[in-house]
């Protein structure tokens, strides 16, 4: 079995074990001094972009004999998208430390599920997913753990993303320099794309793409060489190559026709 398949199986087994543990915790009827309460109302919380939910730890303290009035002993704001994980998990805790340990695990699981949701629409690099989770309000540690798990499961692949990005942008007429700059924004390099994608960025291929891009452009009436060269450099082609191609295109356009 391939290494990636082994990792996917391990992830599935981890998920099965987690769900079994959740059901056991939810069904546990032993006495506990604290219980979980999720407020229904969601609210915005700067600087996070996502909605938030207040998660409280309540203690039933005796008041006026047999009556009991719930008292909040601990509160934690969680992203609204984490509500389902918290609502379906453990509901009773021995103390605040017990709850905090559980909350860390629950937030990691919720962040992982949210990452998978973000990736269902399109491929994203790990750094992009990490930033999205943090912006939504997940702790940095939980967000990083979720991204690492997604990479182990093959849900996130920086190599796969880099390959697709390079192939897409070369078809769009981008030059090597611009592609490299855009990849760096996501913490990636051209080498992450692999040899096959790099083959499309050789000097000969760069020249062909620059020539095709310049040929499709309408010939400027004034300073054509300068304007075409500037256009090519703006698309990420090297300065020397841009000037060379611009001169060739202008010279070809100025050649007298056979008629």
Please describe what each predicted stretch is.
Residues 1-259:
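An alpha-helical, amphipathic repeat domain used for nucleic-acid recognition
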